[in-house]
């Protein structure tokens, strides 16, 4: 058996060896932290995903050892495979930072300001992306595209106005169900997720489209408006389910289970089971088993300390202790990229900006930003 070929790739001055055929995004995720580009459409468990949202664009400053020429344009890291000796710039490239801010602006062009009422708030990838890479104002002055809400069966509601057309739910239905009944209708600005004659989604695994949606476009009707994720305690649990893996996260408040989701990793994707298969869960586990006595509780879910979900969960509430080590100590000596000066990085929460003093809609031209003051 021949040995596996390894390529040496450098991402933001950090070198790692990965197998041939690995994408830049996968290599960056092995390094972790801010080095990994954001991804709104790519999902490692879904074949064919990626290449649509362009949020993972990176700069390749050196193609390979054999051909050291830089690539002339930014490339999608989720689709571009590494070459031996390749050098990639992500957060260290001004081109990437500027392009990503533009992509976020496009994604938010028709997106409603529903965060205060959206069930996805607190775990929304678009919310995180706009906070880290977005701008503090909008230049769009025209009427936004809107759609009516649709019930896609008794468990799922579609808010098409929030959708970013990442296609994740389409790939999920293609690969987990026998027959997909929803997809992308129309083209261009009129494109939307829909079913034929408003047919309901009733497959036993269709609830997984809620977990893969990076925004609040597909929501769980059984959890709708009932609670905020940062008030709930995520607990790992399992049951002997004949249909699926049975490995879930219970979101509790007191003794009440508000919702059940599949377990997710640090990238917001479905975790693999011990057998190495994706841990998709069935509708029975997701929607019908809402009592703690239905499950074997394994213990508290590990939470990223910087997540809003972690608030109030330290000092024993989830069996956790408040961390005392510094950020650099747990990130190989690297300082936090965004926490160094978040106002300068994203122009969000700029202290000198008082939107209430502006007459009419606030735009970038109505107040000075950090970039103007630089």
Describe every region a protein language model picked out.
Residues 2-21, 60, 67, 85-111, ...:
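N-terminal export/assembly segments and adjacent metallocofactor-ligating motifs
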Residues 7-9, 13-84, 94:
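N-terminal cofactor/phosphate-binding cores enriched in small/glycine residues
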Residues 43-44, 116-126:
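Short, glycine/charge-rich beta-strand/loop segments that flank catalytic centers
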């Amino acid at each position: 058996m021949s040995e596996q070929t390894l390529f040496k790739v450098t991402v933001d001055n950090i070198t790692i060896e990965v197998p041939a055929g690995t994408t830049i995004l996968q290599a960056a995720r092995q390094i972790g932290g801010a080095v990994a580009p954001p991804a709104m459409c790519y999902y490692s468990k879904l074949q064919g995903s990626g290449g649509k949202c362009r949020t993972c664009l990176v700069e390749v400053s050196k193609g390979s050892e054999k051909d050291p020429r830089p690539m002339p344009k930014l490339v999608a890291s989720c689709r571009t495979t590494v070459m031996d000796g390749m050098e990639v710039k992500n957060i260290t490239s001004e081109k990437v930072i500027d392009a990503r801010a533009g992509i976020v602006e496009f994604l938010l062009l028709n997106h409603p300001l529903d965060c205060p009422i959206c069930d996805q708030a607190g775990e929304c990838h678009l919310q995180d992306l706009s906070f880290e890479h977005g701008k503090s104002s909008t230049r769009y002055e025209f009427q936004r595209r809107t759609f009516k809400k649709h019930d896609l069966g008794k468990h799922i509601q579609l808010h098409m106005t929030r959708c970013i057309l990442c296609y994740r739910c389409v790939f999920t239905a293609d690969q987990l169900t026998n027959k997909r009944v929803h997809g992308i209708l129309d083209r261009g600005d009129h494109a939307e997720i829909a079913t034929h004659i408003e047919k309901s989604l009733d497959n036993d695994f269709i609830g997984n489209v809620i977990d893969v949606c990076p925004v609040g476009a597909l929501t769980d009707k059984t959890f709708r408006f009932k609670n905020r994720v940062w008030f709930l305690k995520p607990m790992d649990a399992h049951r002997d389910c004949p249909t699926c893996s049975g490995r879930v996260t219970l979101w509790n408040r007191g003794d009440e289970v508000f919702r059940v989701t599949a377990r997710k990793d640090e990238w917001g994707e479905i975790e693999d089971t011990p057998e190495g298969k994706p841990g998709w869960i069935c509708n029975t586990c997701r929607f019908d088993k809402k009592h703690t006595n239905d499950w074997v509780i394994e213990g508290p879910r590990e939470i990223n300390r910087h997540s809003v979900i972690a608030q109030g969960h330290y000092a024993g509430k989830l069996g956790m202790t408040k961390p005392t080590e510094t950020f650099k100590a747990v990130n190989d000596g690297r300082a936090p990229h965004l926490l160094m000066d978040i106002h300068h990085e994203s122009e969000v929460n700029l202290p000198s900006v008082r939107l209430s003093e502006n007459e009419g809609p606030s735009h970038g031209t109505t107040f000075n930003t950090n970039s103007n003051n630089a």
